From Swiss-Prot:
Cross-referenced Pfam families: Cohesin_load
Subcellular location: Nucleus; Cytoplasm
Protein name: Sister chromatid cohesion protein SCC4
Family note: Belongs to the SCC4/mau-2 family.
């Protein structure tokens, strides 16, 4: 009796301190039970250790301490025949600890035991819900280790458990997760398409009131549809989902702001009502207002948000209020795909990816700034400041750091591509140097970014007229990825740079690169690579004077660029080549029309090199037609644009970063010392390579959603075949 009274008293005191936000004192009350000389019942100690571990995971970085409490609690529970919910909670929390510590084999073994227990108890709703929880976590461990078949099997088991209890939100959670795995492994188009159709079918069965309880499920489903469309380079159909995401994110943000204002007012009212000397009439009015505010908060809030779940945040242990979360599913999963801030940034990124090829540079620049600011704020919360390197990271922060660092690289990649498109080479330099510096500080976490950095160095080098260096960096990029599609793109870009040099040796190298690519377009995962290969091959055929075949190839590439990709810059470049071809075939009427369209697009994009390219062909056209007045007017405009380009190039070449970016050398990395912390970092980060929840289709290791690498400029396809324009 004495022990029970002491425990009740300490639990009550812990409740009091927790309501006041005094987490340290709350933990001390619970630790007093665990360390007391008084003999408590096993259940008392178990409940105390469970609650203590949950607090440590949520409010501190002491994962090992939490793990010790949970392991002790699990031992105590073995002597208790029932108490299944406590056992399930213990298994789930301990699994989270192993996940945060990157102890994946122990986590997998623990989850298998938890599933065995869940299948052996009476099969009520609680047992099925916990089966969903454990299958979800088990699938995640398999994904981290790139065991996609086992992950799909675990997710299918979770789906069946959700189906047994007719829980459509959970069914959708597992269906979307299976689509996610299919997108990551992408064995064939048919399997992924079937997974997409299954998601659409399940989504139709969920009523709107249920989706409101799990707002993250909508974002997860829509984002996966965007990834799927981008992977197919189906940018036009991806746009519909991007628009839905953007509208939903704005609506959700406004809703959360309203709720936060209500909560702030409610907190102020509660403080006023706590005064003992408050007049009764005023107290009555404040109480009525309090009731109104609480009803409004309840109406706006997801039903699961008001429940204090024992589960910690699914990713990491950063304490965040429920208004900052986008829950994927109901309790006891309550998981997030990514934190709300990461989803916010990702939506901005999708808007950039869909808008940049269309030349919507003002909106894209604004979104890039917003996304980078969100990421910078989160990196600071994770302790990543200017001097921090990956070896300095807390182990529990590695996963979440990688999410935001990878997102940051995606934004910087798009900034480089955007600035190169509109001929702002100094801005492109700065963004590319930022990418390089982040990579040298976090080489293991950002290992997948090295290929794209080399590719962008090649694009920058080509843009400023360093064609040999451009080819070098594109060839180096092929060595840094196992993606056949990415390798094909890099080789195509290198071939264009070689063709721009124009001498016999370089043309031979271009032929060696393009020849093997020509026969493999059907084996590539997207039309983006095919468009790049067709451009390079068409250019080669033009240099070989096989004009009719060149026209056929370029016409096919133009159709892809226009119908599937919607990339105005690539369309302008294709049109320029086709206009020049028409001129070479003495079809001056068609040449004039094609070149006018190309020049219009190049002007819209502020793409000065392409404008100059078109203007030089116009000069040849007017000379052929004997239109002296048009020729002089055209030359005057061309000279103006030439001077503008030379000014920009001089500024870029005069930058302190120019030499290091074009130099024929890979990025030098600092050496990792052989200490346990850094070895652990390498092991855990390598286990996650390629498995960030942003699939390849966004642009790191696989088909980039918008061809930042279509910077195919500096080519003179007029009379002086193969000569440099600069």
């Amino acid at each position: 009796m004495e022990g029970a009274a002491v425990a009740e008293g300490l639990w009550g005191l812990a409740d009091h301190h927790q309501k006041l936000g005094e987490i340290g004192k709350t933990i001390k009350c619970l630790e007093a039970i665990c360390q007391s000389q008084i003999s408590f019942l096993p259940l008392v100690e178990v409940k105390s250790r469970l609650r203590l571990a949950a607090l440590l995971l949520r409010y501190s970085h002491n994962v090992n301490h939490a793990k010790s409490h949970l392991e002790r609690s699990l031992l105590l529970l073995k002597s208790i025949p029932s108490s299944y919910d406590l056992k399930f909670q213990n298994y789930s929390l301990l699994s989270h600890c192993y996940h945060l510590l990157a102890s994946f084999p122990p986590q997998r073994n623990l989850l298998v035991k938890a599933l065995e227990l869940a299948s052996s108890v009476p099969q009520d709703i609680s047992a099925y819900l916990w089966s969903c929880n454990f299958n979800s976590q088990l699938a995640n461990t398999f994904i981290i280790q790139a065991d996609f078949p086992s992950s799909l099997s675990a997710l299918e088991s979770g789906f069946l458990s959700a189906s047994h209890i007719c829980f459509p939100e959970l069914q959708m959670f597992f269906t979307a997760s299976m689509l996610h795995v299919h997108i990551m492994q992408w064995t064939d188009d048919y399997s992924v398409e079937k997974a997409v159709q299954r998601c659409d079918e399940i989504w139709q069965t969920i009523s709107s009131d249920k989706t409101d309880r799990c707002p993250g499920l909508f974002f997860y489903n829509e984002m996966l549809h965007v990834f799927y469309r981008l992977r197919l380079c189906d940018y036009k159909n991806a746009q519909h989902h991007v628009d839905r995401l953007d509208q939903a994110m704005n609506a959700h943000s406004h809703k959360m702001q309203e709720i936060q204002q209500l909560l702030d007012e409610l907190s102020s009212l509660n403080l006023s009502l706590s005064r003992y000397d408050l007049p009764s009439r005023e107290r009555s009015a404040l109480s009525a207002r309090q009731s109104q505010l609480q009803d409004r908060v309840n109406a706006l809030s997801p039903s699961s948000s008001t429940v204090n779940s024992l589960e910690p945040a699914y990713f990491g242990n950063i304490d965040r209020g429920w208004t900052e979360k986008l829950l994927l599913s109901p309790s006891p999963i309550d998981g997030e795909w990514l934190p709300k801030s990461a989803i916010d940034a990702l939506v901005h990124l999708m808007v950039v990816i869909s808008g940049r090829p269309k030349g919507l540079f003002k909106e894209c620049s604004k979104r890039i700034e917003s996304g980078l600011q969100i990421i910078q704020d989160e990196l600071i919360k994770l302790g990543i400041t200017d001097e921090v390197r990956e070896a300095d990271l807390r182990h529990t922060a590695i996963w979440m750091s990688r999410v935001f660092l990878m997102l940051q690289m995606q934004f910087l990649e798009n900034r480089v591509a955007l600035e190169l498109t509109r001929s702002d080479y100094v801005e492109a330099e700065e963004a590319l140097v930022d990418m390089k510096n982040w990579f040298t500080r976090f080489p293991t976490i950002l290992q997948a970014s090295e290929c794209m950095i080399e590719m962008l160095r090649g694009q920058y080098s080509h843009s400023v007229g360093c064609y040999s260096e451009a080819a070098f960096h594109c060839i180096e990029a092929t060595k840094l990825t196992e993606s056949i599609s990415m390798q094909a793109s890099c080789q195509a870009f290198a071939a264009v740079s070689y063709l721009t040099i124009g001498d016999a040796e370089s043309s031979s190298k271009a032929l060696d690169l393009i020849g093997p690519l020509n026969g493999m377009t059907n084996s590539l995962s997207g039309v983006r690579e095919e468009a790049s290969i067709l451009f390079a091959y068409g250019l080669l055929l033009m240099k070989q004077r096989d004009l009719q075949e060149a026209r056929n190839r370029l016409a096919k590439g133009l159709q892809i660029a226009h119908n599937h990709m919607g990339n105005l810059q690539l369309v302008a470049q294709y049109l320029t080549l086709l206009g020049n071809l028409a001129l070479s075939l003495h079809d001056t009427v068609q040449a004039r029309e094609i070149l006018r369209s190309s020049l219009t697009l190049a002007k819209k994009l502020y793409d000065i090199p392409t404008q100059l390219w078109v203007l030089s062909i116009f000069t040849a056209l007017y000379q052929q037609l004997g239109e002296k007045g048009n020729e002089m007017e055209n030359e005057e405009f061309r000279k103006k644009k030439w001077d503008e380009l030379q000014s920009r190039l001089a500024e870029a070449r005069g930058s302190i970063h120019h030499i290091e970016l074009v130099a024929k050398a890979r990025i030098e990395l600092y050496q990792i010392d052989n200490n346990p912390q850094e070895q652990s970092l390498v092991a855990s980060a390598q286990s996650m390579q390629g498995n960030l929840d942003i699939p390849e289709s966004v642009g790191i290791e696989g088909p980039s959603p918008a061809p930042s690498s279509s910077r195919l400029v500096g080519l003179d396809t007029g009379k002086r075949w193969g000569k440099r324009r600069m």
